[in-house]
């Protein structure tokens, strides 16, 4: 009788162990699947590509479909920054990595924006031509084609710099749509506060061009001058 219970107990324990192992294996597979983010040779572990000869930086991003209808002043924000959910494109690169990549590509940061002068100063620095591409896109679209300015004005994107402020604030801001003292790149067409404070302009993604929510894409920054 004791032997029977001993055998049954051992079989039960073995079954529990198998279930536990299977469960852990399933969790590992789910985690690996969730962790794998890849497109056009870039990934969450290698989100930037620098071509110093052609003066370009290419970044892996993901579309945030909310801002195909809602307004935002945030073009691209690092996904783990405090503003990571507020941008049209969620970036996989950190502000520091992006800043260093632009310098490696030949860009010169303007470093003219401060918290004190932000509402009266237009960002300076190397001018950037920005394009966006994704699987199935008809072409690489310019930033002006994928972002709608309610005033119909052209974007004037500049390598502002601001790495110290970016690391202090930890917002994750990579590309802002008005001049910004924190974002690595921002739009010299408007001064800070034009969107959220003074209501001079509204920005959103161009839903007639951009793909669906969560689509992976690449954004390429070319040093223009």
UniProtKB/Swiss-Prot annotation:
Keywords: Signal. Residues 1-22 form the signal peptide. It comes from the Bacteria. Transmembrane segments: none annotated. The keyword Signal applies. One of its GO terms (cellular component) is cytosol. This is Uncharacterized protein YdjY. It comes from Escherichia coli (strain K12). The lineage of its organism: Bacteria, Pseudomonadati, Pseudomonadota, Gammaproteobacteria, Enterobacterales.
């Amino acid at each position: 009788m004791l032997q029977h219970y001993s055998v049954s107990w051992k079989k039960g324990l073995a079954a529990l162990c198998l279930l536990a192992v299977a469960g852990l294996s399933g969790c590992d597979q789910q985690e690996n699947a969730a962790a794998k983010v890849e497109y056009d040779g870039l990934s969450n572990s290698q989100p930037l590509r620098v071509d110093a000869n052609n003066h370009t930086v290419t970044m892996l991003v993901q579309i945030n479909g909310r801002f195909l209808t809602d307004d935002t002043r945030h073009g691209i924000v690092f996904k783990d920054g405090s503003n990571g959910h507020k941008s049209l494109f969620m970036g996989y690169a950190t502000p520091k990595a992006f800043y260093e990549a632009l310098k490696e590509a030949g860009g010169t940061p303007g470093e003219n924006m401060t918290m004190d002068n932000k509402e009266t100063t237009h960002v300076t620095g190397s001018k950037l031509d920005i394009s966006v591409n994704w699987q199935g896109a008809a072409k690489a679209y310019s930033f002006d084609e994928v972002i709608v300015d309610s005033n119909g004005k052209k974007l004037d994107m500049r390598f502002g710099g601001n790495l110290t402020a970016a690391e202090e604030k930890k917002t994750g801001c990579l590309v802002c749509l008005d001049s910004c003292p924190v974002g690595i790149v921002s739009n010299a067409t408007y001064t800070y506060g034009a969107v959220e404070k003074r209501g001079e302009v509204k920005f959103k993604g161009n839903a007639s061009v951009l793909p669906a929510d969560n689509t992976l894409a690449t954004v390429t920054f070319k040093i223009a001058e």
